[in-house]
Regions:
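Clamp-loader machinery-focused feature within the broader ASCE/P-loop NTPase space
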Residues: 2-136
Length: 138
């Protein structure tokens, strides 16, 4: 997993306007309950999702940026934060069992803080039954 600096650097290079928009959205406390990031592979969608996670959980925000060195940022970068739930395709698809896992996690309280964040990588690879299951609870 990448570091906070590389998340921000990647986003600044690939999606500078989007990064600026999300900095503003978060600073104004206008973050919606869900976002769908679509685009060509390599456009920075996973980096943006992880940057948002670090920005929301970071213990030491500096000029609107996560510091990348606090325990929260490091665990997010390593994929080990208990309040960040990530689902990705198993093989070529995201299956209904993975969405059931998300639903079960969604119903639980945050482990360490007052919020949880869910990231679905490559959501377009959901089976039809997985997508229908997801739509029933979001």
């Amino acid at each position: 997993m990448a570091t906070t600096e590389s998340f921000a650097q990647t986003l600044a290079a690939k999606q500078p306007r989007l990064l600026a928009a999300f900095k503003h959205i978060i600073a104004q406390n206008h973050l919606a309950h869900a976002y769908l990031f679509a685009g060509m592979e390599g456009a920075g969608q996973p980096e943006l999702a992880h940057w948002i996670a670090q920005r929301l959980f970071c213990l030491h925000i500096n000029d609107g940026e996560p510091d990348g060195t606090c325990e929260e940022c490091v665990r997010i970068a390593n994929g080990s934060h208990p309040d960040i739930v990530t689902v990705a395709p198993e093989g070529q698809r995201i299956h209904v069992d993975q969405v059931r896992y998300l639903k079960a996690e969604f119903s639980k309280s945050a482990v360490e803080g007052n919020r949880k964040l869910f990231i679905i990588n490559d959501a377009e690879k959901m089976t039809a039954s997985a997508a229908n299951s997801l739509l029933k609870f979001i």
